[in-house]
């Protein structure tokens, strides 16, 4: 196999790696990049003439919020203008409140009762670092200022200053359902006893990345101040001293939910954990998440290896957890997890899957899945270096 020649930016980018990495890795890199390229929606769409990347070319008829952020992470490496289109599509949907909706469907419907985890600013800042564009940067700053105001005004416990997921459902049942969708972890064990009353560990870490992104896009002491204050609150409030683990916490009664998932490791990814807490999390990883990094601990009584967010392995959340461990020096543990997941991906020739069985590694869910492709690329190319904006590890 040799790379194509011509004017295709994906081909040109892939050619840089041909013969310079293990061939099995090159084949996987090629498959991942072409998955993202192949998911570009064809024909006239509600977002035309912008080119939107669907989560999968097989199902998911629309453009999803946090999927798009992860697509930006991938395609910005070889086609920054295509990456910018993903962000522009979502900016067109932004509500007067500042909320960036969950999805726009191909029939024009917009799901705007809730958002998605705020990873778009992080992806936009990485795009800006890879391919600066002053005009696009101004567009991002205006939209993200409004979006940050939305999260601060509508998704915080005012007295404590931490963030929670929520939604605008007309009934308590709708609000509960839609808040789970806003989290992206639709049916997670984390939410079995409620979600709108929980300070979610991943959300608060994503907001730290939001503030770091704003420091790049919109240099202003305000963003660093908010970042550092949020880090302080995460470390003071979301560390369970009894369990020696980061966990979601009920903002009304102060109780931890006791659920261990890859989200528990997000403070390692953002670098806020002390070395002592990171070491405790490494022990948690060995007991609860190795080798397959399921979406809830193998030891959890509600673990279901085929449950959507109740056991299946998702490459995005597994990457954040494993990269956090890697950045803290737990190389053997992190490398073992990475290699397990990449071997599962390699074992299925021809396509990348939405998620994987955490015991057998068999593929589950949609095929040709975009964010799986994006994180395969990160596992291959951004494993031994610091990911942008994850650089403030506590000493």
Residue ranges of model-derived segments:
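The tetratricopeptide repeat
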Residues: 120-123, 210, 263, 267, ...
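Extended glycan-interaction surfaces of carbohydrate-active proteins
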Residues: 14-62, 85-110, 159-198, 231-313, ...
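Extended acidic/polar, glycine-enriched regions
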Residues: 1-8
